[in-house]
Amino acid sequence: MIDIRSPAPGRVLAVGLTQLIRRGLRGVWVRGDLPISAAVWAANHHSWWDGFVAAAVLRERQRPAALLMDGDTLNAFRFLRSVGVISAQRPRQALQALREGRVLVIFPEGELCSPGPLRRVAPGAGWLGRQAPAAVVPVAVRVISRGHQYPDAFVDISPEVAPADLPAALTSRLAELDAAIRREDPRLPVPGFRCAVRGRVSWDERITRWAGLIRR
């Protein structure tokens, strides 16, 4: 999603989707790097925000991208085609996106699930990686309310794995991400993550800043 080479209407929509992130979340925090070549971004899907978060991270890194979506859902939101969304029922189009060097965002659980451990992983992400060929990259994502007014999105990008190893690697990475979040004071940043997209400032953060200015 968010192909930087999209026509003008698509680019306008891409900017609007990034603003949605900035207004709805406290920020998007990232650990890890993607390969410089084409890649399958294979992530858990436990939040409404997941597709938007992936798009914002890839836009921030200036990576041309596409997102695989269920065909019925895409038919209901046809305008998303202009920002690189592809029907899951069109594998040739997905392969073409990878062969053009894009990052293809896919949620191999196949549906939006409640937050928790990874569910069953369908083989599609690995198949696309083998056929393109392209790197298969497990990406753990967690959107969570911590110690501030607005939720934080954490994106933990793993090194490339063999397609057959994707389920185990993504399961492990998601568990590691959840453990890292639990270990840290909810009011403090999680070590090792950088802010890729800054969003809303909580009232408590504003009050702290004002108090600091008054004391000067």
Which sequence ranges carry the predicted segments?
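Helix-to-loop junction immediately C-terminal to a conserved catalytic motif
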Residues: 9-45
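Catalytic cores of transferase enzymes with a strong primary signal for eukaryotic protein kinases
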Residues: 17-19, 54, 67-69, 103, ...
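Glycine-rich, highly charged phosphate/nucleotide-binding loops
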Residues: 24-28, 84-93
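Residue-level signal for beta-strand positions within conserved beta-sheet cores that form or flank
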Residues: 26, 63, 151-153
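Catalytic core of membrane glycerolipid acyltransferases/transacylases, capturing the structured
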Residues: 33-89
